[in-house]
Amino acid sequence: MGFLSYFRSQKKRSASVAKERLQIIVARERSQTATGPDYLPMLKEELLDVIRKYVQVDRDAVNFQLDREGDCEVLELNITLPDQQDQAAAHDRG
């Protein structure tokens, strides 16, 4: 019986090692998604380009915020639009 218990104890050790490794992988994935997906900077630039096709806004007038709500991530986009008069003057100049 001592011989069999030796192998059983290794299974417990390998299970705990596997559990630790899985926890490390999960923690690493969570830390990477905490800063946002890899495509987020490019998405921001493309959205800014689309907005600028219709409204002349400064880069500082557009605010992007990535929030996590439970299992979902929400990309919030806030744009400070220029006044109608400012937009008309810019359109007349351009």
UniProtKB/Swiss-Prot annotation:
InterPro entries: MinE, MinE_sf. One of its GO terms (biological process) is regulation of division septum assembly. Coiled coil: none annotated. Signal peptide: none annotated. Keywords: Cell cycle, Cell division. Prevents the cell division inhibition by proteins MinC and MinD at internal division sites while permitting inhibition at polar sites. This ensures cell division at the proper site by restricting the formation of a division septum at the midpoint of the long axis of the cell. This is Cell division topological specificity factor. The gene is minE.
